[in-house]
Amino acid sequence: MARRPFRIGLTGSIGMGKSTVARMFRHLGLPVFDADAAVHAAQGPGGEAVNAIEAAFPGTTGPQGVDRQKLAEAVFGRPEALRRLEAIVHPAVARRQARFLRRHRSKPAVVLDIPLLLEGPGWRSVDLVAVVSAPARVQRARVLARPGMTPERLERVLAHQLPDARKRALADVVIETGRGRLPTFRTVRFLARLARAGR
C-alpha cells in the first residue's frame, strides 16, 4: 500500500506570522492547504456553503456570496448560532481538505494550515503540530497595524483562540517568528527536511 504524505499541522494565533511561515513552506516546495482560504471560497460567489448560510441566517448573503460583516453580527455573542454556522462551514472545508490530500497523495509531505487546529479535533489527523509564536508585544503591534483593526477587535478574536502559552505546550514544534525572518526560515527548512524524510 502506498505511503501517504507526512502531514504538518500548522497553527498559531492571530498576528504570530503563520501566513509568512506557510509561504516559506510553499517556497521550499511543500504543498500547503490554507483552511482560511477554503472558508472564503466556500462562502464566496457560488460557494457550496452560501445557500445553507442564507437559509440559516437570512439576509447575510448577496451576489458576492456571504457578507462577512453581516454574518459576524448574526453570530457574535451567540454560541448556538456559531455552532450552526460551524456545522455548515466545517464539512465544506473538510471536503476541500480531502480533495487537497488526494491531489497531493504522491508527495512526501504536505502542510495543513489550520488556524483553529488545536481548538478542535483537527490535530488528530496530522503527524506533527507546529505552532507559530512570537512575543505578545510583537503580536499586538502586527495585528494593530492591520487596516480596520482595533484593540477591542483583537481582544474578541483572542477570546475565541487558545492562549499562545497553551498552544506552545501542545505543540510538537514551536516556530518562533519574533527574531527575524532568517532564524524562522532555518526552522521551517529543518522541518521541511524532516517531513520529507517522514519523521
Feature annotation, model-predicted:
Residues 97-104, 109-145:
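ATP-dependent NMP and nucleoside kinases share a basic, alpha-helical "lid"
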Residues 37-109:
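ATP-dependent small-molecule kinase phosphotransfer cores
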Residues 96-99, 124-125, 145, 149-199:
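Small-molecule kinase domains that catalyze NTP-dependent phosphoryl transfer to phosphate-bearing small molecules
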Residues 19:
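Walker A/P-loop
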Residues 13, 25:
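P-loop (Walker A) phosphate-binding loop of NTP-binding proteins
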Residues 10:
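Hydrophobic anchor at the beta1->P-loop junction of P-loop NTPases
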